[in-house]
Amino acid sequence: HTVAGLDLPLTDEAFAEALPGADAVFLCIPAGAMAEVLPHLVPHLDGRQILADITSVKMQPLGQMERAYAGPVVGTHPLFGPKPQPSDLRVCITPGAAATDTHIGLVEGLFKDMGCSTFRSTAEAHDSAAASIQGLNFISSLAYFATLAEHEELLPFITPSFRRRLEASRKLLTEDAPLFEWLFEAN
């Protein structure tokens, strides 16, 4: 597959140069930027291209893309972080109403060509499940630190595996906090 990327600033000239001949256009932008980007992007699509996103929530961006674009729309959510194990490369595919099996298959094929496994879901089921999983992740992380803060006598007994869990929790609560704040608000 031929890949062309666009970065900021996203100008009409950049869209006009990059999009002719594209079979699919993937928006790798914050879901909150969708409303700002779509009016500039959609006039450069001819209705046959697949418009897809890569975002952590699905209902809002999928709805925005479908309202802005009459062609096929497919939402995607890679369910892994920046340093995944090969077995962790799963991607949720959320087809829009105008997407046929051919459109969905092309998007799934792109991810499979990169070593990912895919599964399909509705946007509603995705967002409900993602909110539950991320909520549990966030709450359990808070529980670790709240418990240890009140029971320092436990610290000498922490195992290496629990220390790794604490480090992941610390990262989630400090470095990833803005992302989780946005996810909670979007769900």
Predicted features and spans:
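NAD(P)+-binding Rossmann beta1-loop-alpha1 motif at the extreme N-terminus of oxidoreductases
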Residues: 1-21
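Rossmann-fold NAD(P) dinucleotide-binding segment
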Residues: 16-65
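Rossmann-fold dinucleotide-binding core
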Residues: 57-118, 125
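Conserved beta-strand segments of alpha/beta enzyme cores
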Residues: 2-4, 50, 72, 117-119
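Short, hinge-like loop/turn segments at secondary-structure boundaries
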Residues: 20-26, 68-70, 91-94, 136-139
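An accessory alpha-helical subdomain
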Residues: 120-187
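Short, basic, helix/turn surface patches
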Residues: 18, 32-40, 100-109, 144-155
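Short gly/ser/thr-rich secondary-structure transition/capping motifs
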Residues: 6-11, 55, 73-76
